């Protein structure tokens, strides 16, 4: 049957009856047909797949297959993206390996350019870059163009067509959007860098060769400022203890708050897991190093350094604060200016007279001075005019008063009873000093600081000031091939450098004669060296330091202009020469007994002993006067002088000149810009372990405080110092003196004669606490620095002026009577001193701060802090050197032989005790011999301070309950010892420890605590330490 006949049979009848019976074979066949036309038995209609079987299958297949298909597509898509990312990462890794400094993104491209230029500037060839930089940028541009090509529609030059279409298709149809790198987003910048025409580059190179140094300098300044900013941010994050110190200077906080803060600080430093009877230093300071890691710009960090940091911040604020040109004291001089003074006192206008105003005033003053002759001529003409009869009559004849003036009450000016008529007439004229702000000592100190921190001016001036000075001194052979030895005389150069306060080859000064402390006399000694001690040159174990020193020399010379080969050759020669020089100096252990070194003679006698040196000519060049052969001098190194002239005769004059100039230039590079900082840092890292150079402002604070300490101290004392602390310290000093007298009476190894003389010496001690009074008197303070000219923009010349003034002032003391009331120590210093030839104790204002002292502290802390310091300095008058000087500061034998033997026996015990201590960090044993003076003072000071504290407790029984701190379960005596121990908390780098042990006369802080407390029966009693424990040994050493 044909298809048509089958179709016909399947059609329904006209009457709507079924064509076939339900049970017929035809019906069974129709149901079995899967895909085709058929009659739906229920409706009687012709349709595809009657019975819905096929439709169900058609619907089911897509529903099941579509999700599976989407999942497969997604997996394939992710695999493709992962492969592309891995390929991209590998390419970037390869690029970074071959160009490690090449950045990735646009802002990183611009980091390669000079400050102020952009990526477009490079494309337009407006800025010239080194070839290496241009190569890097070309590589970057090519790599970026390759990565970004898929996202740039229509461009397929750099890719295979199939690969580009595939990626572009993925980017348009993917279910997850394709991540576009941010450097490929539309930034308006053409991604393809134009090839740099080498010819154009060479043409532009000449055009911009003058601009390049400018850009490099700007980049260097920007980098330095960024480094300083980061350093300041780190410095700003000071510890709670340092913050408390700032609060102290600002007189902030209540009594209870201050005590609570101190208790919290002390608890933080302590390690309560350590038994105080085993190791009290670890018990008191166990957490110090964790809380105060050593700053990168320091070789060590201890309590003293923390206090100096706090004080430096205070001094910085004072020196950077703008000051009106005219001081308040000057403004007070006349009635008119009294008003200005009141405004000045109230602070109105403060900060408006900035540095520019000061400079303007200075220039105006100089302009007026330069026009002095013209002004005088004008004044003469004025006088002639007023002397004329008619004109004089016209000037002197008063005009008639108006009615209003007649009716007005008379004006009565305030009468100054202390002034006479002539004084009032003088007020009509501007005082001379009013036009000379440069005479103000405080302003000079501020200008010295400003000239030091002005990096822009220093960079602009470069090395020219230093080169000019070198030429004036006769030149530096390493820099001058034409240098001639015929014009060289080492004695003339040594005297000239001494005028700049530099002692090279010969040390000379004018000071009190140790055998006649009332007389100033010229004195000579052996030279110092370029490294801390002679052992650095002579001991093979110190070879690495000597190599670092030689490298330091060579790099400075090369930076100054010498060729690298010449610099290295000359540095080698100088190290060899200085090693010989070190060999002729006497070691420290041979110089302990100063009486054996002391030789007093006339210049004629000295000339006979060492005839090669023209002693009179040397001194005449320093004194600016004729010096006679009968002039008496003191010399401590006769043998050295004889060996020196022999060494110099055997040495090439060129080497001698190179060495002397090196020793001078080495210090002068500190007075130019920062170009030598990296060289110095490398050297000091090798010597002390310091990791970074200190910030420039810190260096400048130290320079100004060293060279103009009284001017800085006047600002500090006026603003911050509390005279109550001065009175408290003076009272405590008297208590400590009495404690020493009490101990002296119980000392059984001194005979009565020596005891009596020792007590007289204690009674005669001069006490200098806080500051000298003259610094608060502007005229006296100004006169001290009257001979120094300071310019706000000439740091190099300022330093030379200070050095010249210092040396001249010292030399001028010759033949003058010693003024024992004078202060030689700047007030803003964290230290204390004892002067043997003045029998004087000095406690500068800078040390009167926590943890040494606070007026709200319990007495236990003050006695354990500043009290121990007072006792320490007092005991220096009776240590191995101090005992040689009598009450007047003269050295002679005033002890009996039996008393000397008793002292020596006890001193040997101290020497042996400290010689048994080993510094574990470096494996070096302490030198008990060289540190005995300080160790004796430590032990004596602690005993006296505790004795004075116990006496105070007995005299103030009602205040015993107040001798505690909140949160610390300790008695007053225990707090005394704890504060003493924590004064010496600190840490040092290994290199710095080695240097300290080789040079210092103090024991490390750890042993100043352990050694002292293990000798104290008072400590053992207060902490209940069993006899025989490490901190309470059977054998104890004690001198005082």
UniProtKB/Swiss-Prot annotation:
Domain (Peptidase M13) ranges: 251-1040
Reactions mediated catalytically: Preferential cleavage of polypeptides between hydrophobic residues, particularly with Phe or Tyr at P1'
Stretches of the chain found on the membrane's Cytoplasmic side: 1-55
Residues of this chain annotated as glycosylated in UniProt: 387, 593, 723, 819, 916, 969
GO biological process terms on file: protein processing; proteolysis
Cofactor comment: Binds 1 zinc ion per subunit.
Chain segments carrying region Required for maintaining muscle integrity: 1-45
One function term, GO molecular function aspect: metalloendopeptidase activity
Classification via Gene3D superfamilies: Collagenase (Catalytic Domain), Neutral endopeptidase , domain2
Protein's job: Metalloendoprotease which cleaves peptides at the amino side of hydrophobic residues - such as the hormones Akh and Dh31, and the neuropeptides Allatostatins (AST1, AST2, AST3 and AST4), Crz, Drosulfakinins (DSK-I and DSK-II), Lk, sNPF and the tachykinin peptides TK-1, TK-2, TK-4 and TK-5. Functions in female fertility, memory formation and may also act in regulating insulin signaling and food intake.
Annotated protein name in UniProt: Neprilysin-4
Organism of provenance: Drosophila melanogaster
């Amino acid at each position: 049957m044909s298809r048509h006949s089958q179709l016909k049979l399947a059609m329904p009848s006209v009457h709507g009856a079924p064509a076939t019976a339900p049970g017929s074979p035809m019906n069974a066949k129709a149901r079995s047909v899967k895909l085709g036309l058929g009659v739906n038995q229920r409706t009687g209609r012709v349709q595809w797949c009657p019975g819905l079987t096929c439709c169900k299958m058609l619907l089911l297949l897509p529903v099941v297959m579509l999700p599976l298909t989407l999942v497969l597509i997604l997996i394939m898509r992710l695999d493709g993206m992962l492969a592309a990312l891995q390929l991209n990462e590998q390419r970037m890794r390869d690029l970074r390996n071959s160009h490690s400094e090449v950045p990735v993104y646009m802002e990183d491209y611009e980091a390669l350019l000079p400050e102020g230029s952009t990526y477009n500037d490079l494309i337009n060839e407006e800025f010239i870059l080194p070839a290496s930089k241009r190569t890097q940028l070309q590589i970057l541009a090519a790599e970026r163009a390759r990565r970004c090509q898929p996202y740039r529609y229509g461009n397929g030059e750099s890719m295979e067509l199939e690969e580009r279409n595939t990626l572009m298709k993925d980017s348009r149809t993917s279910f997850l959007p394709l991540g576009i790198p941010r450097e490929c987003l539309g930034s308006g910048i053409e991604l393809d860098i134009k090839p740099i025409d080498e010819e154009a580059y060479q043409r532009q190179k000449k055009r911009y060769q003058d601009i390049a140094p400018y850009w490099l300098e700007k980049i260097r300044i920007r980098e330095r400022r960024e480094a300083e900013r980061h350093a300041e941010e780190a410095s700003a994050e000071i510890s709670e203890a340092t913050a408390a110190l700032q609060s102290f200077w600002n007189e902030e906080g209540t009594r209870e708050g201050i005590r609570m803060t101190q208790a919290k600080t002390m608890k933080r430093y302590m390690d309560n897991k350590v038994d105080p009877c085993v190791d009290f230093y670890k018990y008191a300071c166990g957490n110090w190093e964790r809380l105060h890691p050593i700053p990168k710009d320091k070789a060590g960090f201890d309590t003293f350094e923390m206090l100096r940091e706090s004080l430096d911040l205070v001094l910085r604020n004072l020196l950077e604060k703008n000051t009106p040109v005219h001081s308040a004291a000057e403004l007070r001089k006349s009635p008119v200016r009294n008003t200005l003074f009141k405004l000045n006192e109230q602070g109105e206008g403060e900060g408006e007279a900035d540095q520019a105003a000061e400079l303007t005033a200075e220039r105006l003053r100089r302009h007026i001075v330069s026009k002095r002759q013209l002004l005088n001529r004008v004044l003469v003409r004025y006088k002639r005019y007023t002397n004329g009869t008619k004109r004089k009559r016209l000037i002197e004849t008063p005009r008639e008063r108006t009615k209003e003036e007649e009716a007005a009450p008379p004006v009565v000016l305030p009468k100054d009873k202390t002034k006479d008529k002539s004084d009032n007439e003088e007020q009509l004229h501007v005082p001379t000093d009013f036009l000379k702000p440069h005479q103000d000592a405080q302003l000079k100190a501020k200008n010295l600081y400003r000239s030091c921190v002005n990096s822009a001016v220093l960079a602009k001036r470069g090395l020219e000031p230093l080169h000019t000075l070198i030429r004036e001194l006769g030149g530096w052979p390493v820099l001058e091939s034409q240098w001639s030895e015929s014009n060289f005389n080492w004695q003339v150069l040594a005297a000239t450098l001494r005028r700049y306060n530099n002692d090279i080859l010969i040390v000379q000064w004018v000071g009190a004669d140790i055998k006649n402390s009332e007389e100033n006399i010229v004195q000579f000694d052996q030279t110092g060296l370029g490294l801390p001690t002679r052992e650095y040159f002579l001991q093979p174990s110190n070879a690495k330091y000597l190599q670092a020193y030689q490298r330091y020399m060579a790099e400075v010379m090369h930076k100054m202009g010498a060729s690298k080969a010449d610099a290295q050759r000359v540095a080698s020669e100088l190290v060899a020469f200085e090693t010989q020089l070190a060999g002729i100096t006497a070691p420290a252990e041979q110089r302990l007994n100063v009486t054996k070194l002391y030789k007093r003679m006339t210049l004629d006698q000295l000339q006979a002993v060492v005839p090669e040196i023209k002693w009179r000519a040397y001194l005449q060049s320093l004194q600016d006067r004729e010096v006679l052969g009968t002039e008496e001098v003191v010399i401590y190194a006769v043998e050295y002088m004889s060996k020196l002239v022999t060494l110099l005769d055997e040495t090439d004059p060129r080497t001698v000149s190179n060495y002397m100039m090196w020793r001078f230039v080495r210090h002068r590079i500190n007075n130019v810009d920062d170009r030598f900082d990296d060289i110095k840092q490398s050297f000091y890292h090798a010597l002390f372990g310091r990791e970074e150079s200190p910030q420039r402002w810190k260096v400048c604070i130290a320079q100004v405080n060293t060279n103009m300490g009284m001017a800085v101290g006047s600002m500090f004392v006026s603003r911050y110092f509390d005279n109550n602390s001065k009175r408290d310290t003076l009272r405590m000093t008297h208590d400590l003196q009495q404690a020493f007298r009490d101990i002296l009476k119980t000392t059984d190894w001194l005979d009565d004669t020596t005891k009596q003389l020792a007590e007289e010496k204690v009674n005669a001690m001069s006490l200098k606490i806080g500051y000298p009074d003259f610094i608060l008197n502007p005229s006296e303070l100004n006169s001290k620095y009257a001979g120094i000219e300071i310019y706000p923009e000439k740091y190099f010349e300022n330093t030379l002026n200070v050095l010249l003034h210092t040396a001249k002032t010292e030399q001028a003391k010759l033949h003058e009577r010693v003024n024992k009331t004078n202060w030689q120590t700047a007030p803003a210093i964290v230290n204390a001193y004892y002067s043997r030839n003045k029998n004087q104790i000095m406690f500068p204002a800078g040390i009167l701060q926590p943890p040494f002292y606070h007026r709200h502290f319990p007495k236990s802390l003050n006695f354990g802090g500043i009290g121990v310091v007072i006792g320490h300095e007092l005991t220096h008058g009776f240590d191995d050197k101090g005992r040689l000087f009598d009450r007047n500061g003269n050295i002679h034998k005033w002890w009996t032989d039996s008393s000397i033997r008793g002292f020596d026996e006890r001193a040997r015990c101290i020497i042996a005790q400290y010689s048994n201590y080993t510094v574990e960090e470096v494996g070096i044993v302490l030198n008990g011999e060289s540190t005995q003076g300080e160790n004796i003072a430590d032990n004596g000071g602690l005993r006296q301070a505790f004795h004075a504290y116990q006496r105070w407790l007995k005299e103030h029984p009602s205040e015993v309950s107040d001798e505690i701190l909140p949160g610390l379960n300790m008695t007053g005596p225990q707090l005394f010892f704890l504060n003493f121990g924590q004064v010496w908390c600190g840490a040092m780098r290994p290199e710095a420890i080695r240097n300290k042990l080789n040079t210092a006369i103090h024991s490390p802080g750890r042993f100043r605590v352990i050694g002292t407390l293990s000798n104290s029966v008072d400590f053992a009693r207060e902490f209940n330490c069993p006899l025989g424990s490490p901190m309470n040994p059977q054998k104890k050493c004690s001198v005082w």
